[in-house]
């Protein structure tokens, strides 16, 4: 099928995902990576002084607090060592920054330096030695629900949710200015990447405040959250500027992470973090597991593909859907980082279409 996406999405199958080796790797890792290990420590990253990536990028980080003091963020910045272009560097903002930064490889950064216009990378995570802060991300990455009372998370009703607009304001008003103070940025080449709940945030930002970024990259977004609430937001989507593009990447579970028949749908702790949960274990709250099953049933398996097809009909928006055959929800985090770097660097072209 054609890769041109002015009016229809490019449906690109796993046979074209960085050749067959990527699909083979995804299949090999699938049993161990059905979902991210939410308790895993970060470990060494490309920012280590001994990393070969230091030949192409320099690194720094800082921390800041949420306005309500309930969350503390760690921002990790990777800046190309080459001189900035006349208009500034393109930039890629990455959610779940601890995990995203850990997923970057030295080979990826060296290739960006060698082959194209390397983007500045801004990984927005939390001040913890873990890859994920599940409570914080459940609040920051989910849209506010209409009606009285606070928004609560779908899978774990004791977790506050609905802070996406507040978090987007933090990015716009505090993080972006801090980045611009440190490095020259091209305001017309800003990309946003997120996985799972982070992917949900990417879609929310596109639908509600599309001028915030020019390129939106969502990996296995949690369409099922609150019985598909993001699909209600879609009906009132804000107009996009010409040249905006969207790339949605999905794993093997029927084109997204929302398959209600997936055997991995009974762990409310993982579900509350936006992950496709592992098999049921002793002690799991059956009511929470039932809520998750109901949420997934509310969203058909083909939701991601159809969402992108509708978005491709909007004026000014290029939309592409790519499926990674054999890749689990957890594996999609790492597998989507390379394509995100391609989109942010401009290698994917103005339509976010991957080679």
Explain the meaning of each model-derived region.
Residues 34-89:
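A domain-start/cap signature at the N-terminus of enzymes
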